[in-house]
Amino acid sequence: MRSHFFLFATLLLLISCKKKNETLFVRLENSKTGLEFRNDLKYTETVNPYTFRNFYNGAGVAVGDLNNDGLPDIFLAGNQTSNRLFLNLGEMRFKDITREVGLDSEGYWTTGVSMADINGDGLLDLYVCKSGPKDGEKRHNELFINQGNLTFLEQSKAYGLAETGLSQHAVFFDYDRDGDLDIYLLSNSGRSIGIYDLRAGQREIRDPEGGNKLFRNDGNRFADVSVEAGIYGSAIGYGLGVTVADLNGDQWPDLYVSNDFFERDYLYLNNQDGSFSEVLPELLPEISMGSMGADIADLDNDTRPDIFVTEMLPATWERIKTKTPFEDWDKYQANVQAGYHHQFNRNTLQRNLGFRPGTPTPIWAE
């Protein structure tokens, strides 16, 4: 009996001495970091979800070393509040320098923001996307060229990048491999959602306000080459995310574009001649319906890029049954035949299985 007691006590001691899980992340209070920022939204008579469909699409953030001191700085975008630029002081402390560097922008409905060395001078510049209601003040994208002393010069018009559409985000990449950065500009259409939209042929009709665009860097100015490059720019492209990666292993950058609502996503393979081929239906068997964003990485360490897409699948069965659209078989097949592909309300992970035998075409399985 006594031996049983000692055995039980030993087991209890071993269990109680189990190694605690290590903490991977610790929340730092903004009172200590100095990162004081809130993107609050307020309804007005002229600006609300009924007058501006993308009211709740949110804003962006960019991180980069703007003054080349080895510390990453943070730019936080605001919709109805001003953008904020925080200078990294070291030891996770930041200083708001927005006004002193001339980047205050309250009321201009900023969406995405990117940091990139646009003019090749070794300094990160800022490209700030704008959206908002049609009568919104100063609704054009802004390009802030870094002057090297934590001051910036707005030169969007000089560079041909003062777009006045419904910009969501911009990604910088060298699609033609000529040594400078080009731009894919993602937009989210302001067009209302309706069942009449599900018909063929709309993808080829360009929309100057809500359509995506590709800009080629020609040195001191950018040229819109969307049409000649084969980039869709219609009103049904409700873009929310764009990702750059070499998807077929030819050492040229390709694109994956996430579209919300009924429009399918786009997968562009680089043709190495300044143009792209949009080939998603041939390569991906099924995709997310209301795609939010995508990321591309080698998830299984087989050296091949996999694609993960997030979706708007509700968290509870009640919302799934009340919010998810259901279609009969004939209507579903008609949508597929009209070019909208096989779409489902859930996240999707496209695993890269390699190449089709004897071809340079990759195979993905969901």
PLM ranges: what are they?
Residues 1-22:
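Bacterial Sec-dependent N-terminal signal peptides
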Residues 17-366:
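Acidic, glycine/proline-rich Ca2+-coordinating loop motifs
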